[in-house]
């Protein structure tokens, strides 16, 4: 815990693409330490230990993602000195670079970090734009892993982790996007206020730590648009015939290319080897079957093209991070609960 006098100043950075759930969810959680738990259990609010405020390049209101109206408390020019700057995740096209789009935000982040602020992000692209991730480890939402790795080559991306600390004195912390901003908030409350207060906030808001990481939630396939008609035809064929016993040999024959040429073109077009692509397609289908039905795991293995159920289970565990039975328990129960509503 960081020893200090007075409330912790937490600036929450807003851009037009910001997601309201993370922006205002963080605001609620950072308003809570010291105040809400005593109110819930005794009817008397305690002393608020953190002071959150929304900051943007200017204090003018704007429409954010999904049409939510955001009215910043401060612009960069009149923002109180922050102890922490939080960067919520935001919606941009994963296939596009944001170079130059957030120059003002990048300069401000660099300045306040140099001035001592801790940076906490569930949208690590802005940290990359500020040049703060070079030779650092990072994490980000599974849908943006390639974006981060491709556009900021000095970064070591840890896609399986839901929380990563980095930088000098670990003054940069990143969460994996989605609802893992809750983990980020709890970590910061524990670090700057205290573990007891972080636990109280978790109890008030009934939060659960994302200890599984991102891997079970992530799609194994990144569907890329490609101008390679031969590879497109092979992808379409595999989508209909993923159960075939030798999918790579079959696609090579379909392409009419030499084996090595086919392998190079497939990897260039899809970002995966042909074998990895076939495995990913089969495992995505297996995930759907585990979520929505009660077919035995051995039968599912056979249905998606694996005669050896033990090999299927090992591969599933390695790629997904859970065994098939664990995945069914976690996501099948969610599917059933939603279906009954």
What is each model feature region?
Residues 239-240, 245-281, 301-326:
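Basic/polar phosphate-binding segments, predominantly the helix-turn-helix DNA-binding elements
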Residues 51-117:
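Flexible gly/pro-rich beta->alpha loop and the following alpha-helix that scaffold active-site loops
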Residues 288, 296, 310-341:
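…primarily DNA-binding HTH/wHTH and HhH modules…
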Residues 162, 166-175, 192-236, 240, ...:
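Short, Lys/Arg-enriched, Trp-marked, Pro/Gly-tolerant hinge/linker segments that flank
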Residues 134-162, 200-201:
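A conserved active-site-flanking secondary-structure segment within enzyme catalytic domains
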Residues 105-143:
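Catalytic nucleophile loop
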Residues 190-193, 233-247, 266, 287-296, ...:
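Basic, amphipathic alpha-helical hairpins
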Residues 2-80:
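N-terminal beta1-alpha1 cap of cysteine-dependent amidohydrolase-like domains
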């Amino acid at each position: 815990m960081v020893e200090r006098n007075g409330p912790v100043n937490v600036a929450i950075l807003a851009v037009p693409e910001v997601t309201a759930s993370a922006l205002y969810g963080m605001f609620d959680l950072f308003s809570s330490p010291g105040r809400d738990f005593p109110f819930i259990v005794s009817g008397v609010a305690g002393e608020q230990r953190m002071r959150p405020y929304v900051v943007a390049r200017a204090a003018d209101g704007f429409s954010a993602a999904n049409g939510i109206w955001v009215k910043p408390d401060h612009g960069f020019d009149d923002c109180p000195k922050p102890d922490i700057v939080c960067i919520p995740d935001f919606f941009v096209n994963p296939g596009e670079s944001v170079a130059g789009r957030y120059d003002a935000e990048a300069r401000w982040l660099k300045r306040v970090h140099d001035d001592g602020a801790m940076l906490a992000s569930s949208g690590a692209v802005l940290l990359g734009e500020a040049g703060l991730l070079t030779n650092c480890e990072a994490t980000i939402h599974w849908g943006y892993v390639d974006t981060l790795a491709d556009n900021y080559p000095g970064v070591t991306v840890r896609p399986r982790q839901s929380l990563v600390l980095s930088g000098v004195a670990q003054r940069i912390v990143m969460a994996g996007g989605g609802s893992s901003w809750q983990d980020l908030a709890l970590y910061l409350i524990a670090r700057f206020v205290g573990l007891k207060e972080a636990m109280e906030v978790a109890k008030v808001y009934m939060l659960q730590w994302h200890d599984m990481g991102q891997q079970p939630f992530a799609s194994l396939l990144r569907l890329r648009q490609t101008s390679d008609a031969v590879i497109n035809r092979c992808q379409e064929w595999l989508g209909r015939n993923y159960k075939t016993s030798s999918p790579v040999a079959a696609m090579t024959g379909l392409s009419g290319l030499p084996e090595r040429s086919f392998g190079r073109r497939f990897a260039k077009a899809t970002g995966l080897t042909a074998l990895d692509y076939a495995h990913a397609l089969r495992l995505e289908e297996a995930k759907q079957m585990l979520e929505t039905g009660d077919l035995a795991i051995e039968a599912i293995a056979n249905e998606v093209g694996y005669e050896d159920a033990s090999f299927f289970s090992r591969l599933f565990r390695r790629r997904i991070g859970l065994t098939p039975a664990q995945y069914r328990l976690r996501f099948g129960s969610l599917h059933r609960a939603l279906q009954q509503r």
